[in-house]
């Protein structure tokens, strides 16, 4: 397990990464390919989600990721884009979908998460406060 991950993004790409535990695994992971240093998923999950409220750690990403906000490095899910399952890799890339051999999730949620959306006009709108939907 990789714990206490810290990353710095520049231009949409990880330029620095460190983990208190599992750092060598993290470094190898982000060196897999060019897409491994970019986000493939961002998911907002309220701190009060039923799985989070259960207090259980399943040690299974498919369950645990539903307990907290999470991000994933690597491959984007094409099915998250309109008609994504019919698009070529080039069309997916033109729509901003990342391509990589990996898709690795990690949880970042807590009751301290604040998220703001930025409109096309540059205005900031609160989306989450203290880990909950506004």
Predicted features along the sequence, with ranges:
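Metal/cofactor-centered catalytic core regions of large enzymes
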Residues: 1-134
């Amino acid at each position: 397990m990789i714990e206490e991950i810290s990353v710095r993004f520049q231009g949409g790409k990880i330029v620095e990464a460190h983990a208190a535990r599992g750092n060598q695994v993290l470094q190898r992971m982000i060196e897999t390919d060019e897409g491994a240093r970019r986000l493939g998923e961002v998911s907002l999950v309220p701190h009060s989600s039923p799985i989070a409220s259960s207090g259980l750690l399943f040690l299974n990403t498919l369950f645990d990721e539903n307990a907290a906000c999470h991000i994933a490095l690597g491959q984007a899910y094409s099915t998250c884009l309109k008609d994504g399952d019919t698009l070529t890799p080039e069309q997916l890339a033109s729509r901003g979908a990342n391509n990589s051999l990996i898709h690795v999730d990690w949880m970042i949620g807590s009751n301290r998460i604040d998220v703001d959306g930025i409109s096309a006009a540059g205005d900031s709108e609160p989306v989450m406060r203290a880990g909950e939907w506004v």
